[in-house]
């Protein structure tokens, strides 16, 4: 009898998730024709979910910048979605950055994700931080600016407190939104959110959600992003190296559970790192009630 009651409670618990959430999606510029087809298939598949915006990542060199610019403009023109380019302060002068920002504004782009960017080896120029970039963008036009946060601390930060102060500096410079690095330890995120509030950051801390379809790739990414991979996640993917179908099912389950838990903790907005693949993200959103 008690078992039946537990099952009934579990079923009700699953059915009770009817909170409306907002989603946004990240894509990256394709490097060949096949990847470009995949990108546009993904964009068109996910646009029907009416995301708040979609972002497009960015490399420091001019070729990458041009690709990002072209894709963002095309998304805006062809789909009507709010498209946000990533912009970094690496390998461009302040005047060049101002011109890039003006070009975006003139193209109808109103949202930008402002980042410092990764400094290449031997980089000797004076640092141009994300807070500097936010301030520069504010001087050009009234952009809607998102910045990055690191619940498990940026790998180059001297301390967790120094990293938090740096985030506050970006907010004080004029950033409107905060998007986190992907993570899997929800307690860490919640503690980080509390610490943000304690120093006066009242902007919503939007969690970055990465559905993990390639665990080995995740391990490589985690090694240089300072993201901790919990033991339960290692166990979940154990033995699945040659089983992509099951990996996708695990990825969907983990992502859905994370969103449900975070939603009950008051989180309303979620940013999905799609890796230019729509099927899994679409399925996750569908199960969370985000539908056309």
Curated annotation (Swiss-Prot):
Coiled coil: none annotated. SUPFAM superfamilies: FAD-linked oxidoreductase. InterPro entries: FAD-linked_oxidoreductase-like, Mehydrof_redctse-like, MTHF_reductase_bac. GO terms for cellular component: cytosol. Pathway: One-carbon metabolism; tetrahydrofolate interconversion; Amino-acid biosynthesis; L-methionine biosynthesis via de novo pathway. (6S)-5-methyl-5,6,7,8-tetrahydrofolate binds at residues 118, 181, 217, 277. GO terms for molecular function: FAD binding; methylenetetrahydrofolate reductase (NAD(P)H) activity; methylenetetrahydrofolate reductase (NADH) activity. It catalyses: (6S)-5-methyl-5,6,7,8-tetrahydrofolate + NAD(+) = (6R)-5,10-methylene-5,6,7,8-tetrahydrofolate + NADH + H(+). FAD binds at residues 58, 60, 86, 116-118, 130, 150, 154, 157, 163, 166, 169-170. It is an enzyme of class 1 (oxidoreductase). Its EC number is 1.5.1.54. Keywords: Amino-acid biosynthesis, FAD, Flavoprotein, Methionine biosynthesis, NAD, Oxidoreductase. Disulfide bonds: none annotated. The active site is at residue 26. One of its GO terms (biological process) is tetrahydrofolate interconversion. NADH binds at residues 57, 181. Its cofactor is FAD. Catalyzes the NADH-dependent reduction of 5,10-methylenetetrahydrofolate to 5-methyltetrahydrofolate. Is required to provide the methyl group necessary for methionine synthetase to convert homocysteine to methionine; the methyl group is given by 5-methyltetrahydrofolate. Belongs to the methylenetetrahydrofolate reductase family. This is 5,10-methylenetetrahydrofolate reductase. The gene is metF.
């Amino acid at each position: 009898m008690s078992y039946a009651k537990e099952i009934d409670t579990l079923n009700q618990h699953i059915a009770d998730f009817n909170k409306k959430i907002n989603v946004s999606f990240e894509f990256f510029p394709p490097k060949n024709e096949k990847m470009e087809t995949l990108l546009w298939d993904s964009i068109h598949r996910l646009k029907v979910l009416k995301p708040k915006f979609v972002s497009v990542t960015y490399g420091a060199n001019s070729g990458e910048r041009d690709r990002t610019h072209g894709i963002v403009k095309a998304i805006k023109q062809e789909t009507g979605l709010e498209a946000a380019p990533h912009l970094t302060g690496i390998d461009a002068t302040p005047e060049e950055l101002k011109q890039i920002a003006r070009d975006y504004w003139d193209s109808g782009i109103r949202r930008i994700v402002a980042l410092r960017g990764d400094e290449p080896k031997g980089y000797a120029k004076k640092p141009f931080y994300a807070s500097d970039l936010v301030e520069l963008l504010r001087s050009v036009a009234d952009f809607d600016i998102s910045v990055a946060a690191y619940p498990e601390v940026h790998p180059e930060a001297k301390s967790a407190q120094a990293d938090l102060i740096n985030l506050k500096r970006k907010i004080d410079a004029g950033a409107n939104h905060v998007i986190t690095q992907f993570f899997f330890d929800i307690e860490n995120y919640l503690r980080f959110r509390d610490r943000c509030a304690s120093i006066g950051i009242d902007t919503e801390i939007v969690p970055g959600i990465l559905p993990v379809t390639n665990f080995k790739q995740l391990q490589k990414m985690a090694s240089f992003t300072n993201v901790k991979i919990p033991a339960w996640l290692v166990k979940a993917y154990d033995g699945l190296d040659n089983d992509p179908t099951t990996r996708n099912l695990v990825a969907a389950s983990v992502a859905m559970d994370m969103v449900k838990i975070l939603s009950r903790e008051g989180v309303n907005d979620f940013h999905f790192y799609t890796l230019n693949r729509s099927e899994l993200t679409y399925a996750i959103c569908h199960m969370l009630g985000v539908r056309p």
